[in-house]
Each structure stands twice: as C-alpha cells, then as structure tokens.
Amino acid sequence: MLVEGDKGVLEPVNFVGPVTSLALIHNDKFLCCAQGPCLRIYDVSESRHESDLIKSILLPFHNRIHGMLPCKQGLFVWGGTYFAVVDVETSQVYYDRISDWIFNAAELGEENKFCVVTSKNQVHLLSLSKGSWEVTNTISCEKTPLLFCATVQISGNEIYIASASAFQQIYVWKFNYNNPPSCVSIDTYLVGHEGACFDLKFSSDGRYLCSVSEDRTLRLWSIESSPFLIATGFGHSARVWRCVFLPNKEIATVSEDLTLRLWTWNDKTLTNTYTYTGHRGKHIWSLVVSSANPIIYTGGNDGSVRSWDYKTRIQESCISVSSLFTSKTLLASFCFVKCQKLLCLAKNGEMSIIDNKGKKAIPALTTTSDMSIIRSWKNSFFVAAASNKGTIYVFSYQNTNLLKAIDLHRGKIQQLLTYQVKERYFLLSKSFVGKNQFRVYLQEFDFEADKVNLISTIELELPATFDPTSLTVDEEYSNFLIGSRTGSLALYNIGESNYLSVWRRIHEFDAISSIHIKSSKRDYLLIQTVGRDGYVNLFSIPRVEKSAVPQELCSKKCCDGILSGGLCKKLKNGKENQWVWGFHASNFFLRDETNETNVFFIDCGGSHRPWAFSMEMDIQSFASYRANQLYIYSTALNLLQRNSVLQNGLHGREIRAMDFNPSGDLLLSGSEDTKVTLLEFQSNGNIIPLNSVKFHNSGIQSLTWFSDDILFSTGGLEELNVYRLIQKPEAYLKRIVHEKLCKPNKSNKTYDGDLRITDISVVKATHLGERVLWINTVQSDSTIKAFTYNVDTKQLNCIKSWKYKTVCLVFAEAVIFGSHLLLVVASTDGNVAIWNTFWRDPQIEPLIIWIKTVHQFCVKSLNISRDQDVLTISTGGDDGAISRSILLLEQISENSVVVNSLHNYFFAEAHASSVTGVLSITKELLLSVSIDQRILLWKVEGDSLKPILERYTHVADVGGMIRNNDFLIIYGIGCEVFRLGSLR
C-alpha cells in the first residue's frame, strides 16, 4: 500500500474546523490561528479597520495543531507528537516529532532552543541547528502519571512546570536548564478539583497558579512558600477548557458552555464580573490576550475567531425623578436627544436634561397636567412632545421659545414616530378612536435658526386593524412605509392620505419594530424589517402592482426574546453591518447581528417598563424607569473595532450532511446545531460562508440540491424543508430562503417524537409536468414515502407510503430507468434493496426487485454510479467493511424490471471503524473514508479490491465525503478539502 507516495494524489489544500490554538506575534500585530494542520495569519494592527488574512500555511503534521508559542524566529508550534518552528515571513517549516504527546512548550534564553512538556510528565530540551532538530536532554519528574495538561514558565535559568494528572492532582516542580538533572522531585502537590484539569497557567510573577477543570470551576492557588487554595470560581455551566491571567488581578476563562468569562480576584474570593457570548454550537477551545490593547481573542469549535474588548464596561447611574423637577409631579416620558443626553418630560410640562455633567432644568412647555409623550429627531436639537388633550409641541430643547403648538387630535396622543432624511423632518402621531381604530397624521417640518415651520399635515387612511409601530421615508421616490403591531406593512406616497399597498403577515402577527431601506429603485424597494418576533427579514417590495406579493429574500431568527429596533450601518469597505436591540426576560440587549455577537446585556426589569435607547458607533446609552428612579447606562464601546469576528466559521457541532449544487460553485451543509448553511466553493478550494437558516428543531439528517435554485433538507421530528436560492443583484449576495415545511402527522396514534427522515431523493416528474418534482424519503421507522412538489404553487402532496420491515432506513437514491423509477434503499440490518415504485400509477404497491445483505450491521454510506443499464452500488458499513455490487438492469415488460448481478466485491476489515463515506471514481477505482480518519483508495484487480493509497484526514467524527470535479471534501467536525489530482 502506498502511504506517503503520490503526493499529487489526494493532496490536502484546505481545512475548516475548530480553532484549537491562537497566538499573537510581532508585538501583537499578527494573530496566528490554528485549524487542523492549517495555520492562518491575520493582521490585527490598530491601523487596520478590518483584519486581513495575510497568509495560510499547511503544516505537515499528522495531528492537528494543539498549541503555539511566539519565538525569535517566528512561531513554535506543536500538535500530538509533532513540533515545528515556522518562519512566518518565508513560510519555511522546520518540523520533527518525539515519542510522546506534547502538552506545552517554552523558548529558552538562546535562539532556537526550546523545552516541551510531554504526557509522561517529562521535559525534553530541544535544539534547532541548520534545519535539524536534536533532543539535548530529557528530564523526568519523580511522578510520571498520565497527564491531562501542563504549563511551563521560564524565570532566569529555572524552568517551572505545573502538570495535572488524570487523578485530579496538580504537581509543581522546577529545575535549572543550564545544569539539568535526569530526575526532579516535586515541590508542591495541589489537590481540590473534582474532575480532570484541562488547563494551567502561572501568573507573570510566578506567585500564583490558575487551574480549570471538568468540574466547571476555576481555582486560584498560591504557590509560594506555603501553597494553598485561595478561591474557587463558580459560574460556568459546562467543562472549562482554557484560562489566562489578565492585568489588574483579572482572569479570563472559556468553556464548553460557549462563554468567555472575566473574573476578578483578591486574597479570598474569585468573582465573575463579566460574561461574553457569541460562538455557536458547543466549545470555545482557545484564547489569547493582547498585551498592546485590551483585547481578548477566542477561537471556537464553530471555526470562528472573535475579538472582545474587555476593558470598556457599562457605567450605571441612578437619579431620583423627584430631584429632576421643581414641583411634585410625575414623570410622563423621556428620550435621548443624543447619546448620553437624556431629556425628561413631566406630566405638568416641566423638563430636565441629564448628561455626563449632571442634570439641568429647562423652561417648561405648559402648566397643566396633561403631557404624555416626548420623542426626538436624531442628531438635531428639535423634539416633539404630545399631550393627553391632542396637542403636539415641536420645539428646540436648547431654546424652548422656538416652539410650535398644534391642536391636532381630539384625545390623548398615544404615540409619536420621528424620521429624518436630509433636511426633512417627519412626525407621525397616533390617537385612539375605537376598537382597532386610530387617527393618524403625518406631518413634515422645517427648522430654521429662529423658527419652526410646519410644511404639511396629512391625515392617513389606515388599512383595517392597522396600528402603526414604525416609520421610514424614501425621499428619492417620495414614498413612506409604515409597519404595524400585527406584522403588516403599508406603502404611501408623501402628501397623499390613501395607501398604495398593504402587505399582511410580514412578521406573522407580531409588531414591526423598525424598517430600513437598503435600495430604492423605480419599480421596487429593497427593505429590511426587524420584528418583535425576533426575526430580521429582507424583502423586495413592488411599487406598482397593488396585488403583487413582496418577495422574501432572507428571513433570520436572531435570538430568543423580542426585538425592539435595529440599525444598518454601511462600512468603509462597502459592506453593511446590522445591529438589533430588544429584551430577553428581564434583560435589555444590544446585538451585532451581522457577526452574531451579543454586545452587552443590561438587567433592567424587562420591556414592560418605560425605556429609551440611543447608539452611535463609539458610544451607546440606555435608560429605564422603575420605582420613581431613572437608571441610566452608558458605554463607550467602538462597535466597528471591538467584539467583532475576524474569521467566520461553519457550524458549532458535527456536520452531518453536505452537497454541491449542480454548477459546483455552491455548497450546502447541515449540522447537529440544526442550521443549514450556504457556502461558496472557490476554485482554489477555499470555502466562504454566505448565510445560514434555522428551520429545523433537531439535527440535520440529509441535504440535497435538485437544481441550482431548489434544495431540500430533512431531520428529526419528521421534518422536511424546501428552500429556494436567491441570487438577484439587489440581495447583495446569494442567500437561501425557506419556502415550504412538510408538517409531520401529529395524531395521537401515529406521531413519534423520535421519528427521523434519514434521507431524501429528488427527481423531476416530467409525466406530471415540467415544474413538478418527485420526492422519496426514508424514515427511521422503516417507512418509505413518495411526494410530489409543485415548484410554482409550492404544493407538497404525499402520493404513496409503504414499509420495508421494522428496521431503520438510512439511505435512499432514485434511479430513472426507462419509464420506471427505481429506489435504492439501505438499512440498519445491513441490506440494500431496490424497489420498483411504479410512480406513474399511485394505485400499484411498490415492489422489491433486488435485495442483498452487504454488511453484518448498519450500512453507513451509499454511493451509486450508472453507465446506461449497468448500475454500480458501493457501500460502507458499521462492520468496517466495504462492498461493491455491479448490476444489470433489464426491462422485460411495460411494468416489469429485473436486476441481474454481474459481480460482487467485498473487503472485510477495510477500516478499523465504521466506513462513513464511499465514492466511485472510475470503474476500477473506489474511495472510502472512516471514523478512523483514514482515506483509502481501492482498485479492482480481478475478483477483488486492493488498497493502493492511504491518506489521513484531520476531520474527527467523519460523517461522509462528497466530490466536485477535482476536489474531495471530507466532513464531520469541520471539513477538509483534498485535490484529487490524477485520480480525476
């Protein structure tokens, strides 16, 4: 068998998966990110608005990279038993390996001299000379148990080591590396953790040691003359993987629970002061702290790298309402006129401004107790207030003599919505008339230095049961849009009272919180809406045809809770960033939705309390009212440079299905995290995430493209979803949008919450129409179903349903042979069967025309290739074997097809574990991949299969493989791309 030869065949070109290590080099200008064997280097210098990928280096390691250390020559890297020095400027790699697993390393005083700590609690001293490595000394600890982790620190000529065993003990020991002994006694034993330790760190002065464990705790130890446990930190809800000391007595930890937590400590306690979230799935594996800036970088199992500003905190102040006004009155309303400047209005018309200089009273509007609401126009000195008697006051808060009072409504004004575009100021006011009836006016104002001018007032005709909640204006084409409390959207011409169009259930029956115009054309508007239901939707809205339906280009559930607003900001690079804010339980949150990062949470009591929010890119303010107190929160967080995503990932859990579109430039991936992700596949093997949707409630089981614009996914809970690919230029990029859900049968007699649709096969049903698809699904209860789907009407109908046995069915693939549709089905009993489905006649029961036991246990992979009437079925099994059956199809009558076996190949123990992927390359060549992470190439020689080539994949928990022309992708926990080379 060829193991290391034929480098041009199955050559690894890319790996996308968990970020296992991070390091900063060159005065923290460059961030090194390790994924599998791939080392990616980013420029994260302050001068750059956005981090750029500078270089990608593929290391010749058999194991993935587990750790990195900045050194004089560039970067010292280790993974498993391998280690290397990488010259990041020339991409030169000097590597070697030792016999034991490496846990940590340090650079000694001299150049190209290092020490590594291994799993046997030994230290190897290494020297690099003229490109060759030498182990100059090996120092053993007196205790040599199996280790879980270790750390090392150099102080003068001393090497200090802390190592944690599988028996929950921590050993601290040291020696002089200029005169190293062969064996070293232990200085300190530390005992206290109730589970294995996963990381250890010395403080910079060497006085303290931090440890984290599977018992979910962080522990801080004093390791001076009389070692003892200082404190234990509780807060993580799952295993804690990494820790690091920060300046000013702070510690950062990351965990399986997807949180980055900051801790402060003193001589007795550890306190969790701040928690950051943003990674997806499970596990944050790595973190590193910048010494140049207050930034922490984290790398997750989802493959993303994120940066966090850990110094900018939220400042809180509390002011009694009674101290704001001269008389005994109640607070009516408040709003931000700009960030950190809050304008408060009392019932009797008194006003006060609160800013970072304190509070200041301004002249009152009126002396009657009838004021109800106040709102501001962003970035102006003008505000609008309303009374319970229907009067609107528009004025400058800097000079209340610039006042215009307008008696407009007949009763209490319940809502004011403001909108500014260039020098035009719009105000929408609403009062209650009757049940589901409102009187609404739209006014336009012009503000001069000494006067407030009312340009126009229009009473709007509202659609039935339309309660306005949001407003936006399209000045270019003189339109405005109003969102309602029940998820409807109405389009008007400026200056006209009648609405042009109304569209219902844009956000089902929940309120539209904000509307943003992304593009304005003569025939349509491209708008983004934020709904109280937690969704951000992108629509193409027609201007002309009243009956036309908005086309949904994207719909994304942002988070749990309710969304109260959103903001889009165009960046210097031409891209747009989306922020949303709202409430979850008693917390107010601001979220960077583009990067799927929570910026901050504030415990304010919930959305039912009066509140106000204002944000700029470098400052944010929130205020809430409860118990006659105003609570004001401010932070100076730079939203464009902090808490951002440097590298996007794929999935936070195992990828269970992938498929190429027919054109080969797009990929679809589905994972245990229940998300379906659209990816761009580039000609060099790079994979770029485009967008993801979540419409499954359990892990994805299978995916398939039918055409370049129609795709399907299946999962647990009997879920079958249909999607459409949107590629219109106004959508800015390719997106998948949800089109149809096949709802399970939930009758008491038949519904099974554990029932899974394990695979799907889709072909065109030309005998039923050009736009009709025939869908076959197989289920875990041994049921096979046949559906028709009309692409135009989106109608999904079940045509047939039948059972195989009682075992789980795992794969299905349709083959059209003449006028027949044959369905190849694999199951957990090791059988592969071919059914004649009689798809042209719904009344005829499907019939098994061929069945064979190909494995002792479950069939784990299935591949079918066809050459006219010859069908080749390749399988991999739970028994580690591979099988190949070559069959001849023959139609002997109009309703009858027979299958004749031409040849059967079988190789027992082909792999050491389940074979999760098989792929026919040619008639003579077959590829297989297994949980054992080996890729094998097989060749047909006579009556047998012979392995001729072996490659290793860094993908753990391999789920399968797919091919696209010259590329092969192995997927599981992440995915790895190989170039087939001459195999193609």
From Swiss-Prot:
<feature type="repeat" description="WD 8">
    <location>
        <begin position="461"/>
        <end position="502"/>
    </location>
</feature>
<feature type="repeat" description="WD 9">
    <location>
        <begin position="507"/>
        <end position="549"/>
    </location>
</feature>
<feature type="repeat" description="WD 14">
    <location>
        <begin position="854"/>
        <end position="899"/>
    </location>
</feature>
<feature type="repeat" description="WD 6">
    <location>
        <begin position="326"/>
        <end position="364"/>
    </location>
</feature>
<feature type="repeat" description="WD 5">
    <location>
        <begin position="278"/>
        <end position="318"/>
    </location>
</feature>
<feature type="repeat" description="WD 11">
    <location>
        <begin position="695"/>
        <end position="733"/>
    </location>
</feature>
<keyword id="KW-0963">Cytoplasm</keyword>
<dbReference type="GO" id="GO:0005829">
    <property type="term" value="C:cytosol"/>
</dbReference>
<comment type="similarity">
    <text>Belongs to the WD repeat WDR6 family.</text>
</comment>
<dbReference type="InterPro" id="IPR051973">
    <property type="entry name" value="tRNA_Anticodon_Mtase-Reg"/>
</dbReference>
<feature type="repeat" description="WD 1">
    <location>
        <begin position="14"/>
        <end position="52"/>
    </location>
</feature>
<protein>
    <recommendedName>
        <fullName>tRNA (34-2'-O)-methyltransferase regulator trm734</fullName>
    </recommendedName>
</protein>
<dbReference type="InterPro" id="IPR015943">
    <property type="entry name" value="WD40/YVTN_repeat-like_dom_sf"/>
</dbReference>
<dbReference type="GO" id="GO:0030488">
    <property type="term" value="P:tRNA methylation"/>
</dbReference>
<feature type="repeat" description="WD 12">
    <location>
        <begin position="752"/>
        <end position="797"/>
    </location>
</feature>
<dbReference type="GO" id="GO:0005634">
    <property type="term" value="C:nucleus"/>
</dbReference>
<dbReference type="GO" id="GO:0002130">
    <property type="term" value="P:wobble position ribose methylation"/>
</dbReference>
<feature type="repeat" description="WD 7">
    <location>
        <begin position="366"/>
        <end position="407"/>
    </location>
</feature>
<dbReference type="InterPro" id="IPR001680">
    <property type="entry name" value="WD40_rpt"/>
</dbReference>
<feature type="repeat" description="WD 3">
    <location>
        <begin position="192"/>
        <end position="231"/>
    </location>
</feature>
<feature type="repeat" description="WD 2">
    <location>
        <begin position="142"/>
        <end position="183"/>
    </location>
</feature>
<dbReference type="Pfam" id="PF00400">
    <property type="entry name" value="WD40"/>
</dbReference>
<feature type="repeat" description="WD 13">
    <location>
        <begin position="806"/>
        <end position="845"/>
    </location>
</feature>
<dbReference type="GO" id="GO:0000049">
    <property type="term" value="F:tRNA binding"/>
</dbReference>
<keyword id="KW-0853">WD repeat</keyword>
<feature type="repeat" description="WD 4">
    <location>
        <begin position="235"/>
        <end position="275"/>
    </location>
</feature>
<keyword id="KW-0677">Repeat</keyword>
<feature type="repeat" description="WD 15">
    <location>
        <begin position="910"/>
        <end position="949"/>
    </location>
</feature>
<dbReference type="InterPro" id="IPR036322">
    <property type="entry name" value="WD40_repeat_dom_sf"/>
</dbReference>
<comment type="function">
    <text>Together with methyltransferase trm7, methylates the 2'-O-ribose of nucleotides at position 34 of the tRNA anticodon loop of substrate tRNAs. Required for the correct positioning of the substrate tRNA for methylation. Also plays a role in the regulation of the retromer complex and is required for the recycling of plasma membrane proteins from endosomes.</text>
</comment>
<feature type="repeat" description="WD 10">
    <location>
        <begin position="650"/>
        <end position="689"/>
    </location>
</feature>
<keyword id="KW-0539">Nucleus</keyword>
<dbReference type="GO" id="GO:0005737">
    <property type="term" value="C:cytoplasm"/>
</dbReference>
<keyword id="KW-0819">tRNA processing</keyword>
